[in-house]
A protein has these predicted regions:
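OB-fold/S1-family single-stranded nucleic acid-binding modules
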Residues: 128-146
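Bacterial N-terminal signal peptides that target proteins for export
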Residues: 2-10
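Bacterial N-terminal signal peptides
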Residues: 9-18
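Mature extracytoplasmic domains of secretory-pathway proteins
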Residues: 62-64, 68-89
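Structural detector for short beta-strands of small beta-barrel domains
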Residues: 34-65, 122
Length: 146
C-alpha cells in the first residue's frame, strides 16, 4: 500500500475515534420541567429518620419512607434555557431520583406494577426541602413496569 494512502487512512481513523470518544465524554443533559422525561430503573423503598427529631430511627424517630428510582447510568440535569421558570442548578452524576406521586390514580398505577423495574414518565425538579431525599426528584405523570 502507498505510504500516503496509509497515512490518510490512519488520519481518518483517528478522526473517527476522536469523534466517538468526545460523544462518550459529553453527556447530553436532561432538563427540569415542564418538559417530561421517561426514565427506567429499579424501585427502592428507603427509610429515613422522620419526626420528631429527624435524626435516628434507632433513637425513636418515626421512619419516613421515600420511593427512589435507581437508574443504571448516571444522568445530568440542567436548567431549560428557554424557560424563565424552574430550577437553575446543574446536577451531574445523578443515579437516584425520589418519586413525587401526587394522585390516587398514580398510587394505583404503582400498586399494579408487580416488578421492581419501573418505567417512569414525569417532570424533573430540584430538591427544595428536607423531605426531598435526593438532589433531583421526578414529579410522576405515569408509572409502568419496565
Amino acid at each position: 500500500m502507498n505510504p500516503i494512502h496509509l497515512q490518510a487512512r490512519l488520519f481518518l481513523a483517528s478522526l473517527v475515534l476522536a469523534g466517538h470518544s468526545s460523544e462518550f465524554r459529553q453527556q447530553s443533559c436532561l432538563h427540569y420541567g415542564p418538559s417530561a422525561v421517561v426514565l427506567e430503573g429499579t424501585l427502592i423503598r428507603r427509610a429515613y429518620p422522620g419526626p420528631p427529631n429527624y435524626a435516628s430511627v434507632r433513637q425513636g424517630d418515626e421512619p419516613d419512607t421515600a420511593l427512589i428510582l435507581s437508574i443504571p447510568k448516571p444522568i445530568c440535569v440542567a436548567p431549560d434555557s428557554s424557560s424563565d421558570e424552574g430550577d437553575k442548578q446543574l446536577e451531574s452524576g445523578v443515579r437516584e431520583l425520589q418519586l413525587a406521586i401526587g394522585t390516587d390514580s398514580l398510587w394505583a398505577q404503582l400498586r399494579a406494577v408487580h416488578s421492581p423495574r419501573l418505567r417512569v414518565t414525569g417532570e424533573l425538579f430540584h430538591a427544595i426541602s428536607g423531605h426531598h431525599r435526593t438532589r433531583v426528584l421526578i414529579w410522576v405523570i405515569q408509572i409502568r413496569a419496565a
